[in-house]
């Protein structure tokens, strides 16, 4: 699947300019001369494809399409037939990273300057959101003769996009009120609930949709479909929890940093380790850390001290345990209804590596 996935990505987002109808509905440019279409195709490629390819070509783990393809195979389907949709899931994720990097003013992604740093904010935002529409093209390419199934897949995908945007909205607005309450009272329940919900929506919804795709494409029964969706959500949520931890130590690939260390602390975010630290640090120490996190002018040394404290108090360990517990619960439910297949263990191993084998997003 890995090699073919790159081919499917290139089919949806070609590395060279295409006819304008790769991007806009057929007939819109009818009657225009070939030279005009060539110029339009070049401009659309520069404004829509190149910013996305910048991030796609930088690598990434491709775990979302990989897991969905493996789930399709476990269920007796042919993942290669649905390769374009698996690729479109990766493109949607890539687009969300581009938008997220603008919102966080991140300088680095996958070891390269972020898309907005290279192409500008306006282009990165437009190209990033345009990547969501690759799924519609992929469904048309794959299921042109099955509008009912295509409609069900679009419903699942759009529901995931709505959830992801709601999660991002919660992430942007932050959980400062709840964190302030936790610091004042020592009660972390509210802030933990909101951080968990944000993670489920922002990071769990799209993998859940991918696993729902696997169920729909293979005609799985309702119990199995629900278990697949729950497992996909668990994998995505657990991945985000461990990503919160990875932000404290940095993420490297072949010895190079793939993104800036401590971005969450620098951006004043309330993360899972910070929320779990409420019950693991003395009240005065917690107050000092929280004051640094919410102060935009805090020094790099102060921020480094926050990261060290969150690691030393055991909050990061608790996050890893929570991620594992999520995975185990969802897997136990799924395994009980999966068909017998030698690929079942492979699916499980891939999920655990996804969550705990941190390299690049």
Residue spans of the language-model regions?
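A glycine-biased, small/acidic residue-tolerant capping/turn segment at secondary-structure junctions
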Residues: 107, 246-256, 286-293, 345, ...
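Divalent-cation-assisted or electrostatically stabilized phosphate/pyrophosphate-binding catalytic cores
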Residues: 109-130, 181-202, 226-230, 252-280, ...
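Conserved N-terminal diphosphate/IPP-binding helix and adjacent helical/loop segment
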Residues: 1-94, 98, 102-117, 171-189, ...
